[in-house]
């Protein structure tokens, strides 16, 4: 009898693991991935040079989560797979206003790259360059104006964009920090404040 109970218990645990895998698969099915850049790189070794492909991939759920990853391999598909897996592990959550744009304007930088993100009214669309557009669209933003200065390097542009997104704050979180009501912040933002600094002033 004890042996039978152990078997049943093991089966339950197995089914639990199966349900966990199913949930992970469902989450993966909801994700959108975009290949931003791929190039061939060479590494000098004692016997000569080894060539690999380097891939840059952005992954998001179009509902406020996004991440990016890099992968290297001798074959393009493997490099893309590695980059995609890394992007899934590095996803961040960004609060969106009305589920379509940013709560406030923001700036980000990485190395020589600088980006400016501006919240936009409905119908504006995603006005942004290639690497930035990939991040913003997979994040789920529908209306935004983005500008990049200082670099055309896709790696720096994406890192700078992610830097700007990490600084986004919703009225609820700002209100909690300031001990104010959300309604007060929203009213002040509608009067012309478009950044956390302006809201908190």
Curated annotation (Swiss-Prot):
Key words, A-Z: Ribonucleoprotein, Ribosomal protein, RNA-binding, rRNA-binding
Alphabetical GO biological process terms: translation
Region named Disordered: 1-28, 173-201
One Pfam family named in its UniProt record: Ribosomal_S5
Family annotation (Gene3D superfamilies): 3.30.160.20, 3.30.230.10
GO MF annotation: an example: structural constituent of ribosome
Positions of the S5 DRBM domain: 31-94
A GO CC term attached to the entry: small ribosomal subunit
UniProt subunit comment: Part of the 30S ribosomal subunit. Contacts proteins S4 and S8.
Summary of the function given for this chain in its UniProt record: With S4 and S12 plays an important role in translational accuracy. Located at the back of the 30S subunit body where it stabilizes the conformation of the head with respect to the body.
PANTHER family: MITOCHONDRIAL RIBOSOMAL PROTEIN S5
Protein name per Swiss-Prot or TrEMBL: Small ribosomal subunit protein uS5
Species the sequence originates in: Maricaulis maris (strain MCS10)
